[in-house]
Every structure is written in C-alpha cells, then in structure tokens.
Amino acid sequence: MGKTSKAKQSKILRQGSKKAETLSKKISPNTKNLPDHHFKLVKVKRGLDGLGLFAGEDIKKGEIIIEYIGTILNKEEAEKVTTSMYLFEVNRNKTIDGSVRWNIARYANHACDPEGNAESDIKKGRVFIKAIKNIKEGDEILYDYGEEFVKEYIAPKGCRCRAVKHDYGAKGHVSK
C-alpha cells in the first residue's frame, strides 16, 4: 500500500468520526433526547504507551472530544468476554465493548492525575471523552482509566504515564 497524504488522512479521520457517530446512534439505546455532537478532529499515532489518540485541532476545556462506542453488552455477556481490553462499564448492567475497529476513542491512553487532560462523561447510556483542560493540536489525549482497571491491568506491569505520583500502587513507573 502507498503512503497516504496528511490531507487525505485528515479527511479519512473526519469521515471515520462521522461514520462512528452514525453507527453509535444505531447501536446505543436511549439516545433520542441527546443533542447531536460534532466531535473534534483526532488522529491515531504512536503515543505514550503504544498507539495513542491525539488532538488534530485545538480543543477547549469542557468540549466533547469523541464518543466511546462499540457493541452494547449486558452484565452476563460482559462477564463472558475474556479477550477484550476495551470493555467500558457504563453501569452495573451495561458495558460497551470498544474493541471494534471503528472505535478510535479506544486509543486514548491512561494517565494518572494530574497528567490527564480528559475524562469519561456518561450521559444517557453513552460514553464521551471530554476535555478537562485546554488541549493543543498535536497533544496526546489522556485520561484516568479508574482505580479498578489500573489495579488489575496497569499496576502489575508498572504505569508508564509521566505522572510523578501514582495513586493506585503502580510499580515500576518508567520515567520519560
């Protein structure tokens, strides 16, 4: 395959975001009372820990960046999934399996406070990644995955975020 120009990549990502937004409306219940969101341009490239999600434009504090989308699972279905690292528990009875290719929000990496610049925001059964700080174009989008996930999956290997202090007992912190 040949190289794709930056302009074409941007166009693809914008189309991908629109496609993902449309697909999320089809598979996410309880969305009729939510306004349509115009998501920010984001890029996937090598980041802090593997692939990462990066701002393709300046993003202001409080703006919704992207929606975390995927297959909606009930509690029993989610408990049977053993191969996905992209499960996002919305509530006790609903989980989103974000391992689908068109969910580029899954590339937002973890950061311990205060290094994160985004947070998850759950509204009417949908999960959005929202800026908690101004984010400049080119900055990696990072948020705290939460204590349970960090203790189970990140702490045993050592957290690789840039934070000086890790509240979840992460060991083997790798400084950048």
Question: What is each of the regions a protein language model found here?
Answer:
Residues 13-119, 174-175:
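Catalytic cores of histone-lysine modification enzymes
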Residues 2-12, 17, 112, 117-176:
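C-terminal SET catalytic tail plus cysteine-rich post-SET Zn-binding segment of SAM-dependent SET-domain
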